[in-house]
Amino acid sequence: MNKHQKPVLTGQRFKTRKRDEKEKFEPTVFRDTLVQGLNEAGDDLEAVAKFLDSTGSRLDYRRYADTLFDILVAGSMLAPGGTRIDDGDKTKMTNHCVFSANEDHETIRNYAQVFNKLIRRYKYLEKAFEDEMKKLLLFLKAFSETEQTKLAMLSGILLGNGTLPATILTSLFTDSLVKEGIAASFAVKLFKAWMAEKDANSVTSSLRKANLDKRLLELFPVNRQSVDHFAKYFTDAGLKELSDFLRVQQSLGTRKELQKELQERLSQECPIKEVVLYVKEEMKRNDLPETAVIGLLWTCIMNAVEWNKKEELVAEQALKHLKQYAPLLAVFSSQGQSELILLQKVQEYCYDNIHFMKAFQKIVVLFYKADVLSEEAILKWYKEAHVAKGKSVFLDQMKKFVEWLQNAEEESESEGEEN
């Protein structure tokens, strides 16, 4: 069967699609066009932003995103490792970039705005920019100290305004950066810039969302991964808020472990003397205050039993159970603040577990008689230290007992005066 040649349409010109037009550009052509435009715009960052906005319609930002961001940050295309590919040819580089900018927060913030505008205009660059920043952090050893500082400031500002996620910081945990002290030094500069944009709560919240709150010690070599070393390093750098945050995080981790072990010992019905000894040792070893422990003890004690579902029976069951563990609670409620925390925990528990609503007053009286709670703590709770949960119900329950305490106090005072 003969194959016939397909007819060719003559006299017709086809317009190249814009997408295909873009793909004709090679990285070097892309680089030259970008460098020329940045040099023409000069130090006028508004002009730079406009140039980048308009040029995106004819340059393929999607394909050459790494080249685009290399040049905007370092002024040149970067080879693997961070060295400049065109270091010897000034015509292929620009001085109008982050690394050539003045080393002050306001100047770098203005550069950050250029990145913000570019990524808002071309949303598809968002992921590419995140990848670029992770890459640049891996290349820190190739950059000078002042370049590292400017990159840290830029990263902190962009983290502050939400352009970058905190996950970029994982690059800092690279062994070589950690061992040479670059990771910790860079992190301090970055956090300072971040906290100049946002408050400490916002910064720590972002760290938690990125699951980095428990990894901050990894900024230091293994032999220096202690809370004390971190706290001193960051406090000396003016970042006490981060030091305090890490201490709290470490304390929370310790408390979880302590709670788990306590729960196990209570379920095995270990003698109270043994539990007291264990808790005291853990408090000393982990520098835990009594105020941090009393709430844990209450939670563990209440979790150690299967409660009756009938409201009329649960109060009796609770009193019997708590009477057994009152000596344990008494040991760790020797301070007024600890007593108030315990009272608030009892209040919250009785509110959250509806069968216990009517048992609150009976529990407090039991603790008073067992020397777990003092008269002063109960009166302070009643007057000002109660929490909002079910307060009207519980204050009403406690009214007669509080009146009795106040009368007893007045009688005691009058007897003292007579004597």
Swiss-Prot record:
Residues 1-22 are annotated as: Disordered. The modification Phosphoserine is found at S412, S414. This is eIF5-mimic protein 1. The lineage of its organism: Eukaryota, Metazoa, Chordata, Craniata, Vertebrata. SUPFAM superfamilies: ARM repeat. Belongs to the BZW family. It is found in: Cytoplasm. Pfam families: HEAT_5MP1_2, W2. Keywords: Acetylation, Cytoplasm, Phosphoprotein, Translation regulation. Interacts with EIF3E. Interacts with EIF2S2. Interacts with EIF3C. GO terms for cellular component: cytoplasm; membrane. Residues 248-415 form the W2 domain. Translation initiation regulator which represses non-AUG initiated translation and repeat-associated non-AUG (RAN) initiated translation by acting as a competitive inhibitor of eukaryotic translation initiation factor 5 (EIF5) function. Increases the accuracy of translation initiation by impeding EIF5-dependent translation from non-AUG codons by competing with it for interaction with EIF2S2 within the 43S pre-initiation complex (PIC) in an EIF3C-binding dependent manner. Gene3D superfamilies: 1.25.40.180. It comes from Homo sapiens. Coiled coil: none annotated.
